[in-house]
Amino acid sequence: MEFVKQADTEVFEAMQAEKNRQQDKIELIASENFVTKAVMDAMGSILTNKYAEGYPGKRYYGGCEHVDVVENLARDRAKELFGADHANVQPHSGAQANMAVYSAVLEPGDTVLGMNLNHGGHLTHGSPVNFSGQLYNFVDYGVDKETEQLDYDAVLEKAKEVKPKLIVAGASAYSRSINFAKFREIADAVDAYLMVDMAHIAGLVATGEHENPVPHADFVTTTTHKTLRGPRGGMILCKEEFAKKVDKAIFPGIQGGPLMHVIAAKAVSFKEALSDDFKAYSKQIVANAKLLGEALNKEGIRIVSGGTDNHLLLLDVTPLQLTGKVAEKALDDIGITTNKNTIPFDQESPFVTSGIRIGTAAVTTRGFGEEEMKEIASIISLTLKHHEDEAKLKEAAQRVQALTEKFTLYA
């Protein structure tokens, strides 16, 4: 950051402060992770200088022979990771990947079946405040009130009732495995396309820790950060028959020039994800999440659906007489970063919520293991149960500091 320091002290100081925040706090936001230095180097490379509208071998600018190599590496590695026919690595985000699939196969007003945001879905799965809910007729499905898990029979009944052109599977706050084969059966029963948004679980899918949606779905979208531990960006995988439609939907449909420095970082992260080290890392993410959930349960913290099958846990804080907003602030004050989150059948607004969402991808990258999960659960319990007790909060903050000093970030 030395060049930034010389050129712009204000930006440098903000970057330095953020570096300190990441070092000094425990990152439990489920959608965040820490990239490797190699990925970071690619992101900050000279490839940011190159415009490359189009696709490898078919660009609208000259001088693209080297960025073509980079994009082909990213595409080939993505296909190898997930066993896909086709990969488009140009989407700037997961939201744009979803938008591209919608525009490739839908007309405005078409009916789509997606997961309710309050039950664990995503804004781009039909929220009325999002383009998806404004352009298309989204109808939602949710979880069973008793089990707080997906009820596939209910999803099938809803699909038969509304006859969607597209079914969207995948979630942003659902801690259980998703049966993609069952979603394929449901889609086939109503002659619908199936799109899976695996943004949260892509890293787990790549290593076999979660069922792979690629053999079942017509389209699979994802972000490249989160459990995949790449740069912030998006990607679309699809069957060969949809490749041209998908590519056209991205460019020239909704994007212009691709971010070649980000695509380079994607390529690097995909190579990392193909390694045995990443497989071990991914396995540890799930082990840590399960252990953290068990430890929190022993502390008397209610876990939505009773546990987790992936990297994510959704905590219901209402039995503690708290809101998600208050819980998030209390934890942040002692050095644990989370986010307030709605839970199924939540009575609070999205700005208040009844829960918090946590995940283990970032802390696992940092080196935290089973003993640290038990300690984190104990600290969370102490903080939430005594959120107005200064002595208890001071103790919690000191215990957080002991953990962050033990596991240095970007040493």
From Swiss-Prot:
<comment type="pathway">
    <text>Amino-acid biosynthesis; glycine biosynthesis; glycine from L-serine: step 1/1.</text>
</comment>
<keyword id="KW-0663">Pyridoxal phosphate</keyword>
<feature type="binding site">
    <location>
        <position position="117"/>
    </location>
    <ligand>
        <name>(6S)-5,6,7,8-tetrahydrofolate</name>
    </ligand>
</feature>
<dbReference type="GO" id="GO:0019264">
    <property type="term" value="P:glycine biosynthetic process from serine"/>
</dbReference>
<dbReference type="GO" id="GO:0005829">
    <property type="term" value="C:cytosol"/>
</dbReference>
<dbReference type="Pfam" id="PF00464">
    <property type="entry name" value="SHMT"/>
</dbReference>
<dbReference type="InterPro" id="IPR001085">
    <property type="entry name" value="Ser_HO-MeTrfase"/>
</dbReference>
<dbReference type="GO" id="GO:0004372">
    <property type="term" value="F:glycine hydroxymethyltransferase activity"/>
</dbReference>
<keyword id="KW-0554">One-carbon metabolism</keyword>
<feature type="modified residue" description="N6-(pyridoxal phosphate)lysine">
    <location>
        <position position="226"/>
    </location>
</feature>
<dbReference type="InterPro" id="IPR015424">
    <property type="entry name" value="PyrdxlP-dep_Trfase"/>
</dbReference>
<dbReference type="InterPro" id="IPR039429">
    <property type="entry name" value="SHMT-like_dom"/>
</dbReference>
<dbReference type="InterPro" id="IPR015421">
    <property type="entry name" value="PyrdxlP-dep_Trfase_major"/>
</dbReference>
<feature type="binding site">
    <location>
        <position position="241"/>
    </location>
    <ligand>
        <name>(6S)-5,6,7,8-tetrahydrofolate</name>
    </ligand>
</feature>
<comment type="similarity">
    <text>Belongs to the SHMT family.</text>
</comment>
<keyword id="KW-0028">Amino-acid biosynthesis</keyword>
<dbReference type="InterPro" id="IPR049943">
    <property type="entry name" value="Ser_HO-MeTrfase-like"/>
</dbReference>
<keyword id="KW-0963">Cytoplasm</keyword>
<comment type="pathway">
    <text>One-carbon metabolism; tetrahydrofolate interconversion.</text>
</comment>
<keyword id="KW-0808">Transferase</keyword>
<comment type="function">
    <text>Catalyzes the reversible interconversion of serine and glycine with tetrahydrofolate (THF) serving as the one-carbon carrier. This reaction serves as the major source of one-carbon groups required for the biosynthesis of purines, thymidylate, methionine, and other important biomolecules. Also exhibits THF-independent aldolase activity toward beta-hydroxyamino acids, producing glycine and aldehydes, via a retro-aldol mechanism.</text>
</comment>
<protein>
    <recommendedName>
        <fullName>Serine hydroxymethyltransferase</fullName>
        <ecNumber>2.1.2.1</ecNumber>
    </recommendedName>
</protein>
<dbReference type="InterPro" id="IPR019798">
    <property type="entry name" value="Ser_HO-MeTrfase_PLP_BS"/>
</dbReference>
<dbReference type="InterPro" id="IPR015422">
    <property type="entry name" value="PyrdxlP-dep_Trfase_small"/>
</dbReference>
<comment type="subunit">
    <text>Homodimer.</text>
</comment>
<feature type="site" description="Plays an important role in substrate specificity">
    <location>
        <position position="225"/>
    </location>
</feature>
<dbReference type="GO" id="GO:0030170">
    <property type="term" value="F:pyridoxal phosphate binding"/>
</dbReference>
<feature type="binding site">
    <location>
        <begin position="349"/>
        <end position="351"/>
    </location>
    <ligand>
        <name>(6S)-5,6,7,8-tetrahydrofolate</name>
    </ligand>
</feature>
<dbReference type="GO" id="GO:0035999">
    <property type="term" value="P:tetrahydrofolate interconversion"/>
</dbReference>
<feature type="binding site">
    <location>
        <begin position="121"/>
        <end position="123"/>
    </location>
    <ligand>
        <name>(6S)-5,6,7,8-tetrahydrofolate</name>
    </ligand>
</feature>
